């Protein structure tokens, strides 16, 4: 049995924008800790790394959810599922230098910042394979540039 589900594209609610922008605050607080020059510098860098990695992984979870609920067809979903696990795997790869005692967190922050800033390209690709809410790309670009840019900025201070 096949269920034919039709999705009506509705604009994102204002709450999505408010919550999204509020989601930038932890990275801004981490930046303030790093730039304060106080003993919280290392804590700020580690928190900035962790938050960027969590959010990047969360993005993959959103992509997974979109693939499950709004895909155009099962064939289109295969690539979406592969895309959806990439953020978690890339976040893990950026964590490995710390485990192995290599230089960290500067390069890891830089890579995460770049990945975050480029992540809306995945959403663009996704938009041809599943339904995205109206305003999605606008919000995604703004949040990705905001979080990715702040993360990349902090990499310079690591």
Label every model-predicted segment.
Residues 95-118:
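Transmembrane helix-loop-helix
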Residues 54-55, 59, 114-125:
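Alpha-helical transmembrane segments and their membrane-interface exit regions
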Residues 42-58:
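Loop-to-helix transition at the N-terminal end of transmembrane alpha-helices
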Residues 23-30, 81-92, 139-154:
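Small-residue-rich segments of transmembrane alpha-helices in multi-pass membrane proteins
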Residues 33-45:
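Short, hydrophobic transmembrane alpha-helix segments
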Residues 1-12:
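Short, Lys/Arg-rich, polar N-terminal cytosolic tail immediately upstream
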Residues 65-97:
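Helix-adjacent hinge/juxtasegments
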Residues 122, 126-148:
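Interfacial loop-to-transmembrane junctions
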């Amino acid at each position: 049995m096949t269920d034919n589900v039709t999705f009506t594209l509705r604009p994102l609610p204002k709450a999505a924008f408010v919550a999204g922008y509020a989601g930038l605050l932890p990275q801004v607080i981490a930046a303030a800790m790093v730039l304060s020059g106080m003993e919280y510098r290392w804590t700020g860098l580690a928190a900035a790394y962790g938050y960027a990695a969590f959010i990047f992984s969360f993005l993959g979870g959103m992509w997974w959810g979109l693939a499950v609920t709004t895909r155009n067809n099962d064939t289109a979903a295969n690539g979406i599922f592969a895309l959806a696990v990439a953020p978690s795997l890339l976040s893990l790869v950026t964590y490995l230098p710390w485990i192995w005692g290599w230089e960290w967190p500067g390069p890891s922050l830089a890579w995460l910042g770049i990945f975050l800033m480029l992540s809306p390209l995945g959403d663009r690709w996704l938009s041809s394979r599943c339904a995205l809410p109206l305003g999605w790309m606008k919000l995604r670009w703004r949040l990705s540039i905001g979080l990715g840019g702040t993360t990349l900025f902090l990499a310079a201070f690591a």
